[in-house]
Amino acid sequence: MGKGVGRDKYEPAAVSEHGDKKKAKKERDMDELKKEVSMDDHKLSLDELHRKYGTDLSRGLTTARAAEILARDGPNALTPPPTTPEWVKFCRQLFGGFSMLLWIGAILCFLAYGIQAATEEEPQNDNLYLGVVLSAVVIITGCFSYYQEAKSSKIMESFKNMVPQQALVIRNGEKMSINAEEVVIGDLVEVKGGDRIPADLRIISANGCKVDNSSLTGESEPQTRSPDFTNENPLETRNIAFFSTNCVKGTARGIVVYTGDRTVMGRIATLASGLEGGQTPIAAEIEHFIHIITGVAVFLGVSFFILSLILEYTWLEAVIFLIGIIVANVPEGLLATVTVCLTLTAKRMARKNCLVKNLEAVETLGSTSTICSDKTGTLTQNRMTVAHMWFDNQIHEADTTENQSGVSFDKSSATWLALSRIAGLCNRAVFQANQENLPILKRAVAGDASESALLKCIELCCGSVKEMRDRYAKIVEIPFNSTNKYQLSIHKNPNTSEPRHLLVMKGAPERILDRCSSILLHGKEQPLDEELKDALQNAYLELGGLGERVLGFRHLFLPDEQFPEGFQFDTDDVNFPVENLCFVGFISMIGPPRAAVPDAVGKCRGAGIKVIMVTGDHPITAKAIAKGAGIISEGNETVEDIAARLNIPVRQVNPRDAKACVVHGSDLKDMTSEQLDGILKYHTEIVFARTSPQQKLIIVEGCQRQGAIVAVTGDGVNDSPALKKADIGVAMGIVGSDASKQAADMILLDDNFASIVTGVEEGRLIFDNLKKSIAYTLTSNIPEITPFLIFIIANIPLPLGTVTILCIDLGTDMVPAISLAYEQAESDIMKRQPRNPKTDKLVNERLISMAYGQIGMIQALGGFFTYFVILAENGFLPTHLLGLRVDWDDRWINDVEDSYGQQWTYEQRKIVEFTCHTAFFVSIVVVQWADLVICKTRRNSVFQQGMKNKILIFGLFEETALAAFLSYCPGMGVALRMYPLKPTWWFCAFPYSLLIFVYDEVRKLIIRRRPGGWVEKETYY
C-alpha cells in the first residue's frame, strides 16, 4: 500500500477476454494486500511532508485543490464488494449438492410418466406422484436451509458502520465540518476525544492524544499519539493515526496520507472480502457421497437397461426400468435428515454458548486439527488483575482466581498497609453506582485497566477504597502523562501522630526508582543503598519476565513547618518535593488466563489438536500467558530457554531441539513460506507475538499448507481476513467487532476458549452420528431396489411399489434416522486424533459394503420371504411366479391361473399384489428395528452403550405405529394402495431382524477382540 501502489490499482479492471487474466490479477492483488503495511510518511520531516502533499501546515489545502484531488482519487469510502444476490443464495440451496440428485430423480420420474402416458391407455400415476414428492422434498429442505443461513453474510456492512460521518478539516485557513467521504489526501484534519479518525493521518501536532487501536492491532491499552517518529514500523510509530480507530482523549492535528481503500483499514476490508472461503469439509464429504450413490445408481440402471433389452423387453419398458432403478437408489429422506441433524447440533451448541451461523461449520469444528487463538479476552480474562506485589524485600503472590480461591499473603504488614494506601489514593478509578450486591471482581469500573485492577485488589484486601479516599481527602493531583510516566497526588492525613500532608506517587519503575532516596522495610524507613537498589532492580526484572506490567509506588510525609494547614500547592509551577521520596513497593498486573483455559488446552492436546497463540502483545508477555494457559506446557523449552540454561548464544542451539517456539512478528516478516512451514512442522507449541493482521492470515495459510483444518479465533477488525480464510472462523460475541462476527462461521457468546473445546466435541460427535444415520438410511435401499431388479430378471409380479418406497424413505425411516443425532458418544471422542479428511470419509467403501452388501441383503431376504409367504397362501407358489409378470400386469386378461388352477381377475390379482407391497413395506420396518439398534454403535456392544436415547426409543414406536396406520387405516387402499395385513404376516421378518442383531454384535465383538484385524479393516466404517 506504499507509494508504489498507484491509484489505478484499485479501479475495477476492464472485463478481459480471458477469465484467467482476471484470476491472475486477483491473485496479484491479494498478494499485494498480504504484504506488510509499507509507508514512509511517518519518517518525513514537516518540511518534506509539505513538499510531498503541497499542504500549507497552518492553512491546509485550498478548496479548489481539494476538489481536484477528490475528482482524481474518488470519495474517501470503502468500495463495497460484489455481494451475492439473495435469489442466487436461494438457488444454491435448491440446486446444490444433494438437491441436484433429487432433482434429476424428479425429472426422470416426470419423463417416465410422460412416456407411459404417451404409450399406455390408462397409465399408472406412481411416477407422477414420485416426481411431485421428490420436488416437494427438495423445495422444503432448500427453504429450511436457506432460512438457517440467511441470518449470516455481508462482511462489508459492518465496515460501513465504521466510516465516520463528519470530519473537521482546515481549508483556506478556515475550519470547516465536511462529510467524511469528501476528505482528500493532503487535507489538514483536526480530531478530538470521542471522534473517529476519518482517514490515515500523519500527526503534526497533538495534545494528550490517545487512540484506541484495539480493533486494528489487538492492543487493549489506548495508544499515545504525538508528532514524534518512534518506530520504523508504521503500525507501531506514534505519529500515524489510522482510519476508523477512535480518538479516546486529547486533541490532534494531522495531514491525510491515505483515504478509502488505500487506508490500512481499507486494505483489511478488501482482504477480507476478497478471500475465498473454500468448501467446508462436510460439504466435500456430501459431494463425495453423492458421487458414490450416483455411481452405484447409474451402474445398476445401465446394467439392467442392457439386461432388459437382452431379455427382449421393448426399449420403452427398458427406459422405464432404468429410471425406476436410478430413482430407487436415491435416498429421498437423507437430505432432510442431514439438515435436521446439523440444526439440532447447532441448537445444542447454542445452549453451550457457541452460536453457529453456517450449519456445515458444526462438523468442521469437529475435524479441526489446529486452533490459532487470539490472546486477549479469549485465553485471558478480558481485564487486568493484580498478580504479584513486592514489599519487605520479597515477592508475594496475589490471588488472581475468578472466585478468590488461591493463595494469600500477610496482610498485617505495616509496609503492605502503606503500599495499599498509595494504590488506593493515587488512583482515579471508581466503581460504577448500584453494584453493592455484586462480587467485587464482577463490578464494572470507570477507569483504565491497570487502575481498575488496583482498585479491585485493594477493595478485596483492605475494605472500602471510597471510605479510605474520604478519610484522606485529595488536595491536588498531577495526572499521568507519557513524558513524566508517573501520577502524583497530595492528601490530607487524618492520623494526628504524623505530618498533615501525605504525598503519594505511582508510575513506571525506572522513573520511580530515580526519585527515591529511602525505602520502607517492615514499616521502618531505611536509606536506599546499592544492595537494596540491586534487589529492587532484580525484582522488577523478574516480574517483567513473567510478562507482567509492573508499577512502582512511593510516598512522602510533607513536613508541617514547610507545608502548614491551608498551604496552596501549585501543580503547574511545582512547589513541593518530587525527588528523595520513600520507596514502598511494586505491584504487577497481568491479564490472567480464564479459569477453564488450561484444562481446555489440555483437552485439545489430548484430542491431537495443536493450539497456536497469535497475539499483538510483547513476546515476554505472550510467552508468560502461553505458559499460564498451558499452550507452552511444563518442561518444554524455547530456543532462548535452552541457550540460557546452557549459557551459550542462541544461534548455537539447534532449533529442532526446542519443542516450544516464540516467533516475533518482525522475524515473521522476513521469513519465506518454507521457513514458516518448518516452524509449524517441527515445533509442537508455538506462540506468535507482535503480529499484524496480514501475518495472522499468512499463519493460517501456512497451517493449511500442512494439510491442517484450521479454526481461528478473533475479535478485532484486524482478524476478519484470517477468520474468513480459516476452515472455521470463531468470533467473540461480547467484545468482538461487527466485522469479525460477519466474517466468522461461529460466535462464542461468552468469549471463552473453553467453549471452542465443547464445540470440537459436538462436531466430532455429529460426524460419528451422521455416519450412523447414513448407514441406517442406506441399508433400506437394498430391500427397496432388489424387488425391482428381480421383477425385471425373473419376470415376477412387482413385490414392492414406488409409493411404498416413499412411505419408507420419507415416513417410517425419518424419525429413527434423526434420533441417531441424539446418540451419546461411544467412547471418549476427545482422546482420539482429528480425522484425516483425505482418508476418513463420512461415507466410505466399508460403510457401503456393510449397508448394501451385508445388512441390506439380510433385510431384502426378509422382505422376499414375506412376499412369497403371502402369494403362496393365496395359491401362487414361488416356482409358478417365474415369467408370470406379462399376463399378471395385463388388464385385459381376467383368467390367470394360480398353482391350484383357480382363475384370478385383473382386479383380484392387483389387490393381492398391493397387499404384498404393504407386507414387504412392513417387513422392511421390522428389519429396520434391528438396523436402528445396531447403528447406535460402531465398535461397542449395544449392551455397553445401553438404550438411554429416549428419542431413538420413540423412533422405534413411531415407525411401527406409522406402518400400522398405513396398513389398517380405512381408505388407504384407494389413497396409497395399501391393504390390511393378517397379524401373522408381521412376524415373517422377525427371524431376519434377530439375525441382523446377532450378526452385528458378533462382528463388533471380533473388532474389539482383534483391533486392526481383517474384520475391522473390512467392516469398521
Swiss-Prot record:
Q: Which parts of this chain are annotated as the region Phosphoinositide-3 kinase binding?
A: 80-82
Bias-annotated ranges (Basic and acidic residues): 1-11, 26-36
Pro-sequence residue ranges: 1-5
Q: What is its EC number?
A: 7.2.2.13
Q: Which SUPFAM superfamilies match?
A: Calcium ATPase, transduction domain A, Calcium ATPase, transmembrane domain M, HAD-like, Metal cation-transporting ATPase, ATP-binding domain N
Name the catalytic site residues: 374 (4-aspartylphosphate intermediate)
Q: How is it modified after translation?
A: Phosphorylation on Tyr-10 modulates pumping activity. Phosphorylation of Ser-941 by PKA modulates the response of ATP1A1 to PKC. Dephosphorylation by protein phosphatase 2A (PP2A) following increases in intracellular sodium, leading to increase catalytic activity.
User: Looking at the record, which segments are called Mediates interaction with SCN7A?
Assistant: 594-715
Q: Which residues are recorded as modified (Phosphoserine)?
A: 16, 38, 45, 226, 450, 482, 666, 673, 941
Q: How does it assemble?
A: The sodium/potassium-transporting ATPase is composed of a catalytic alpha subunit, an auxiliary non-catalytic beta subunit and an additional regulatory subunit. Interacts with regulatory subunit FXYD1. Interacts with regulatory subunit FXYD3. Interacts with SIK1. Interacts with SLC35G1 and STIM1. Interacts with CLN3; this interaction regulates the sodium/potassium-transporting ATPase complex localization at the plasma membrane.
Supply the name of the protein: Sodium/potassium-transporting ATPase subunit alpha-1
The organism encoding this protein is Canis lupus familiaris
